[in-house]
Amino acid sequence: LYSFFAFVIMPNKNHKESRTLFVREAKKLYQKEFIKWFKLTAEINPLLRFFRNVEVKIPTLYVMGEEDYLFLPSVRKMTEAHLSASLFVVESCGHVVNVERPEVFNSAVLSYLGKL
């Protein structure tokens, strides 16, 4: 189940390190905890739709991989609708940007924080 779910979220060859990390950490959870976490994912897109309609006035940076097929479309819509939200999309990267491209992730975050 862990490997399958990891492959659904991170299917590309360049996502291998993130998949491996996900599976390793998921195995540390008790099965009951993992199932609760898995069910939580069903609530993500409705939650993102909610946040699209309710703007948070705090400056917010979303760092997403262009290959994050699960969440990027919703986050893109949200950041287009909110003045306080910014989106930084990392090319050739999947769901776990800080693992796949840590230098790019850190640079984007530090640059954003430096402008606040």
Regions found by a protein language model. Name each.
Residues 32-33, 69-70, 104:
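Short alpha-helical
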Residues 99-113:
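Post-His helix in hydrolase/transferase enzymes
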Residues 1-54:
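Conserved alpha/beta-hydrolase catalytic His-Asp/Glu region
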Residues 57-93, 99:
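Conserved loop-alpha-helix segment in the C-terminal half of the alpha/beta-hydrolase fold
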Residues 28, 114-116:
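Alpha/beta-hydrolase fold catalytic core
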